[in-house]
Structure formats: structure tokens, C-alpha cells
Amino acid sequence: MNNPGTSGTISVIVPVYNVEEYLPRCLESILGQTYRDLQVILVDDGSTDGSSRLCAEFAERDPRIECIRTSNSGVSAARNRGLEAAKGRWIGFVDADDYIEAGFYETLVTHLTHSDKQIVCCGVRAEDTEGNRIERFKGRRFPAVEQDFDRDDALLRYLNPDTRILYWAVWNKLYSAELLKGIAFENEKVIAEDFDFTLRCFLRSNGLRYIPDELYHYLVRPGSAITGSRFSKNSFDGMFFMDRAVREIQRAGIGGEVIKCALIGREITAAKTLRDYQRGNREAEGPENAEADLARCRETLSSGREAMRAPLARRNGGSAWSAVTLKSKVLCFIAAHCEKLLRFI
């Protein structure tokens, strides 16, 4: 049952690709939401296992489900297809191997309707396939209480990978549909596409409401995109998006700590990209033919130095959102001065 004072459909976009083992749990958690006014859009991205059958079976059970079948084009294209079909007042995303608490959407929409913000974001519990908690962000000081961030505050807490406390993904957030008009995922990129989409939402928004409750369960499984280690041409996607982030922030006329954090984030991303390249395990047709991308990473480190000038991030205390860990300072220094040593760190 929906809370009094909250009304309107939430469009939930679920990209589906070969997740037969996990899809039933995901869909049961969505259909079991205490907030009932849902449009559940399943975008089957050309699955070759039993996922298509499961989508059809669940659609027969519940009229709130709409199934869209596409040829395999990747998660970004699938999400964009879902955005085209969305009719709700609010829009959310769930990955098909994840699941959500029963009060996930009721909690988020209640916060949106009682706030002037256009985005609400909740805490995340990362888990392995056995349900055990995985600590993905040790040392991060995530807010322990509900908190509103204006646009620039949200950007500060999002851009620097060493001090990021706002999760980059789209799936632990609920967005005003009005905010998302004209914003789409980058179809040709497969890494950090969530980061780019969320950043552009932040830039357009008036900020967000953060609630610490861990209402979203994020599955980290062997072989998933986030855990893959092979270096390919797609490994430059993060650098592409950090370059775009700097340009978009400059275009918006935002300076001060925000642009400093963006520049620092770009340098750290360049150093990590060069490190992963030097470690090898490359696809033959990929980065060996990407000298321009490698040169862009090197140029960023040689012309920047914001990361080296930034204060050290402290595990317990400190409010310098442009701070950088000692590990990242060393990484940036070695990448700039003796790149081949990166394979050993």
C-alpha cells in the first residue's frame, strides 16, 4: 500500500541478459514492493539462456510487467530502450542479478515527495553469491544519517575516486522523470557508463537526498563486468568519461573545489589505466591499436599534477573533498615518471 501523500507511477527498468539463475529473485523483490504503482520494464538484451522464458512467465503473472526483446546491444542500449518506454512520474533501475528490500521504492518515493530534490539515493549492501557482505569501500566515511546535498556538494562527494561517498551506480537511486528527459546512456561504452549518466543527472539537478539505509543488494559475482580483469579497448572508457566530466563541469561554469576534484579524478583514472595496461593480459585487437588513448593518459599526467598537490586524505577525519590517498599519489607519480614500473604495483 502506498503512503498517503505519495502518488504516481514508478517506472522500473531492468536490463536482462543471461541471468536465468538470478532473475526470479530480482523480479520477486520488485513485484513484492510495498509501493504498488509500478511499471516494470524488462528489456531482454538477446538472452540465450532461459531468461527470455522467465520474463514471459512473470509478465503473465503480473500485468505491471512489460517485456521488450532486443538483439544483443549491451546494458546501455537496453537501459535506453527502457527509458523510451518509461511512462512513470519517477524512474528507477535494477540490475537483473540484484534484488531490493520490500520497502525500497516506498521509502525512496516518500523522501522525494517530501523534499525539493529531484534524486534520492540510498545505501548499498554488496554481497557475494552466498549472501556474505563484501566491503568494497573500506575507509570511506559514508553519511550515517539522512542528508540533503545541493548540486555542488553532491558533485564534490562524487568526483574524486579516493574520497567518493556517493555510489556511482544508477540502481540505488530514484529520479524524477522530468530530470531525465534528454539524458541517455552512452551506447558504445561498457565501463563507467553509470558514472557518466549519474554525473549528467547531478549537473542538471538541484541536488539529492541521501538516506543511509541499505535497501539495495548488489551482487558481486565471478565473471561479472565489474570483476573482470582483462585489459581491452573498453578499458579506456573510464578515461573517456572523466575527460567528458571535466568538459561538462567547465561548460556549466562550475569552478572551485568541484573542478579541482574532477581534474584529480581524471589524473587518478589516467594512472590506473596505464597501470592496468602495463600489467598486460591484453586483448590482441584492443589496446595495442590504441596509441592515441595511451597518449591521452600520459598527457593528462604530465600536464596536470592536481593529485600531487592535493592534501592527503585521512581515514579518520578531514573535510578536504579534494584530498588524495598516499597510494594514489605514488601511483600518479610513477605513472608520470617511470610508467613501466606500474606493472609491479
Region roles according to the model:
Residues G8-S11, S29, Q39, D196:
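Cell-envelope/extracellular polymer assembly enzymes that use nucleotide-activated donors
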Residues Y99-L208, Y218-K233:
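Donor-binding/catalytic cores of nucleotide-activated saccharide
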Residues P24, L38, D49-E57, Y99, ...:
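Acidic helix N-cap motif at the loop->helix transition within catalytic regions
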Residues N18-G32:
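Short, well-formed alpha-helical segments that are part of the catalytic scaffolds
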Residues T70-A86, Y99:
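Glycine-rich, basic loop-to-helix element that forms the pyrophosphate-binding segment
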Residues Q278-I345:
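Membrane-interface aromatic/basic loop that binds lipid-linked glycans or pyrophosphate carriers
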Residues S29, R36, D44-R53, S71-S73, ...:
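A conserved acidic beta->alpha catalytic loop
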Residues I91:
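Short aromatic/hydrophobic "clamp" motif used to bind/position activated sugar donors
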